[in-house]
Each structure stands twice: as structure tokens, then as C-alpha cells.
A protein has these predicted regions:
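Transmembrane alpha-helical segments of polytopic membrane transport and secretion proteins
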Residues: 1-44, 296-308
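Periplasmic/extracellular loop-to-transmembrane helix junction in inner-membrane transport proteins
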Residues: 17-40, 54-100, 121, 264-276
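Interhelical loop and adjacent transmembrane-helix boundary motif
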Residues: 77-80, 236-287
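Transmembrane-helix boundary motif in ABC transporter permease subunits
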Residues: 100-132, 145, 297-305
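Transmembrane alpha-helices
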Residues: 101, 179, 202-240
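Amphipathic cytosolic juxtamembrane alpha-helices at the membrane-cytosol interface
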Residues: 107, 120-125, 129, 188, ...
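C-terminal transmembrane helix and the adjacent membrane-cytosol boundary/short C-terminal tail
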Residues: 115, 181-185, 196, 223, ...
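Generic hydrophobic transmembrane alpha-helix motif, especially the helices
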Residues: 133-171
């Protein structure tokens, strides 16, 4: 190519860009229709969520934004009587979730370490992955019935909050294991190899290099797993009785929790004060789950800033 009028020759890419034309009429119509369909699908998906949130907030916000709701229980409160709070149910929900996390998090993290660091590509890893896939799809009532049959019917243990936590472990474990597994896969092999080159053992490499690198993602998975199980109702209905007062003992057969508090007032007349407490309990559960999701986002953002 030669230079004309002191200007550089046009490349093939430039010629292609200059010859680019706007899409034809039919293509423009199809693009507009696709945009409309996608937008409509998004709106249809968001409308039920907004409707549910609006209904719960409008019917339960009055009680939730009072101090007595967070500081008092339902002991001595009848459906026709004003007052009382959800302190017992909030404490019970957090206690059950904490016990569940103490069991599910170590099992999930260690299971992911086994799959990625020790048994990658083996039959054992495929068997564990298949089992986890099955667990991730079982309904909560199946997990509750399994724990009831195993711990209460066969071993003779009593119904308790610990039994509820064990059932929730079966639901939380797949989330923790899968999220940890994905985070461990993202850790560059060069970090492991550099540690091995310095003479560090495999286990210390995992504890000092791999886990700290993936800690942000692992923590996010744990928090999301907790948010997933805190609203489950079937294990609570089957494995423990609802208590209207505060009970800190996880071995007791009665325990207050937000899902069972909601269930206990489902048959009350809409004009009774107890009916408003049901909506307030639902709003409280939404607030807790929302805070956990915000915590997960904060952990993920902090881990990204730390990497930079």
C-alpha cells in the first residue's frame, strides 16, 4: 500500500468498520422483540417478590420497630392480648443456626479439601460429589424424618434443638462444600508449587497458603448456607416443640424459633393481635436473612480489596 496525500493507508479493519451498516429492518424488529421479552420476564419475576415484601412489611413493621419486640418473649401472652415480642424465637433461631454451623462448616471445608487437594479425579472424589449432589436436592422434611428415624427411633435420643441442627446440617453441608470446593479450585497451583519448593509439607501448605487465599469465598459460602437453613420449618415441626418462653438449652425438647412462631399463629383471626405478631415474625426472619446476605457481600468485597 502507498501513502496518499500524506495520510497513512487504511487497514483492512478500518475498511470493514467503514463499510459496516446498521442492521436491516427484520433484524431490528427481532432485536426489539427479544429485548421486550427479556424485560417482561424480569418484571414478572420481580413483581411477586416485591408483592411479598410489601405485604410482610406493611403488616409486620409496626411491631418490629418497637423495643419490646426484641426484648420480650411470648410467655403469658394470648392471641387476644397485645404485647410480647420475639426475643425467645430470635435467640432460638440463632442458637440452632450456630450449632448447625459448628457441625457443617468443618465437615464441608474438610470435605472440599479432600476432593481438591487429595482425591482430585479419583473414584472416591466422584462418589463424594455424587452424594453431595443428592443432598443438595433433598427436601427439608426428608432430612428431618431421617434424623428422627436415626437419632430418636433407633438410638433413643429425645427431640431437641440439637436434632434440628443435625437435620439442618444435611441441608447446609452441600452449600458449604460446593462453595469451598470452587474457591479452592481458583487458588493458583503456582502458590502451592512455590510452597512445596520451600520444603513446606502438603498439610501446612493447605493451612497456611491455600485456605487463607480462599478464605473470603469460603466465608461467603458459609454465610449463604446459614441464610438458606434459617428459614426451614419442617425440621422444627418434627424434631422440637415450640416454646413461648426463652430456652437456652439445646438439649431441651422445646425451643422457640421464628419459623415455628409463624406456624403457631397461622390459624388466628386477622383481627387478633396475635395475627400481627405472625407477620412481624416473618419480617424479622427476612431482616436476619437480609443481614446475612449483606454480610456475605461485605466479606466478598473485603477479600477482593485485600487481593488488590
Amino acid at each position: 500500500m502507498t501513502v496518499l496525500d500524506g495520510r497513512a493507508p487504511r487497514s483492512a479493519t478500518t475498511e470493514t468498520q467503514l463499510s459496516f451498516r446498521r442492521p436491516s429492518g427484520p433484524r431490528t424488529v427481532r432485536n426489539a422483540l427479544a429485548t421486550i421479552y427479556v424485560t417482561l420476564a424480569t418484571v414478572l419475576a420481580v413483581i411477586p417478590l416485591v408483592w411479598v415484601l410489601f405485604t410482610v412489611i406493611s403488616k409486620g413493621a409496626r411491631l418490629v420497630f418497637t423495643s419490646t419486640w426484641w426484648l420480650q418473649s411470648q410467655r403469658g401472652i394470648t392471641p387476644r392480648r397485645e404485647g410480647g415480642g420475639a426475643y425467645h424465637a430470635i435467640i432460638g433461631t440463632l442458637e440452632i443456626a450456630l450449632i448447625c454451623a459448628l457441625i457443617a462448616v468443618p465437615l464441608g471445608v474438610l470435605g472440599a479439601i479432600f476432593l481438591i487437594e487429595y482425591a482430585r479425579g479419583t473414584r472416591a472424589a466422584r462418589a463424594v460429589s455424587f452424594t453431595v449432589d443428592i443432598l443438595s436436592g433433598i427436601p427439608s422434611i426428608v432430612a428431618a424424618l431421617f434424623i428422627y428415624a436415626l437419632f430418636i427411633t433407633i438410638f433413643g435420643f429425645s427431640r431437641s434443638a440439637i436434632a434440628v441442627s443435625c437435620a439442618l446440617v444435611l441441608l447446609m453441608l452441600p452449600t458449604v462444600l460446593r462453595s469451598t470446593e470452587e474457591m479452592l479450585k481458583l487458588v493458583p497451583d503456582s502458590l502451592r508449587e512455590a510452597s512445596y519448593a520451600l520444603g513446606v509439607s502438603k498439610w501446612k501448605t493447605i493451612m497456611k497458603v491455600v485456605i487463607p487465599t480462599a478464605f473470603g469465598g469460603i466465608s461467603t459460602g458459609v454465610v449463604l448456607g446459614l441464610a438458606r437453613v434459617m428459614g426451614e420449618t419442617a425440621p422444627l415441626l418434627i424434631l422440637v416443640s415450640y416454646a413461648v418462653g426463652i430456652n437456652f438449652s439445646p438439649t431441651s425438647d422445646t425451643m422457640g424459633a421464628l419459623p415455628t412462631m409463624i406456624n403457631s399463629g397461622r390459624d388466628q383471626a386477622p383481627t387478633l393481635p396475635g395475627y400481627e405478631r405472625v407477620w412481624a415474625a416473618a419480617f424479622t426472619l427476612i431482616i436476619i436473612v437480609m443481614l446475612l446476605n449483606l454480610l456475605a457481600r461485605g466479606i466478598a468485597r473485603a477479600s477482593k480489596l485485600k487481593e488488590k
